[in-house]
């Protein structure tokens, strides 16, 4: 009985603080995406041709530290054969989740016929206590 009381006393005095779980899911990548956490590359999709519907998920939690974390998403247009010179179509769609709930998102597509390598870049802040 004493050990049960001690257990609950410890739980009350020292509550377990759970770190939120963060992930990102990409549903469109045309043609290649890079994800950086605090300026460290944590994901490279490689080239994806044909703009298919995707369900690529990445657990961000192992890369996050206490305090403010910067998540940067970059989209590269083109293909392995340097088709970015003439490829004016690009698209990206993704959603960031905190404990399974939508936290933030990004969606853009070529509206101006822009060609080139990095055609999209967006930053998101994630704060951990």
Segment roles from a protein language model:
Residues 7, 11-37, 42-44, 63-129:
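Beta-strand-rich recognition domains
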Residues 54-58:
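Short strand-edge motifs at loop-to-beta-strand transitions and within beta-strands
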Residues 1-5:
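Positively charged n-region of N-terminal signal peptides that target proteins for export
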Residues 44-53:
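Extracellular beta-rich ligand/substrate-recognition surface
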């Amino acid at each position: 009985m004493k050990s049960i009381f001690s257990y609950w006393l410890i739980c009350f005095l020292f509550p377990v603080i759970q770190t939120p779980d963060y992930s990102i899911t990409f549903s469109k990548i045309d043609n290649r995406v890079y994800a950086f956490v605090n300026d460290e590359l944590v994901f490279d999709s490689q080239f994806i041709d044909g703009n298919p519907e995707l369900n690529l998920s990445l657990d961000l939690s192992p890369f996050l530290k206490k305090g403010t974390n910067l998540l940067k998403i970059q989209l590269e247009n083109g293909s392995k054969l340097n088709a970015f010179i003439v490829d004016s179509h690009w698209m990206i769609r993704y959603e960031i989740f905190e404990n399974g709930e939508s936290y933030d998102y990004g969606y853009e597509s070529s509206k101006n016929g822009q060609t080139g390598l990095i055609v999209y870049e967006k930053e998101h802040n994630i704060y951990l206590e």
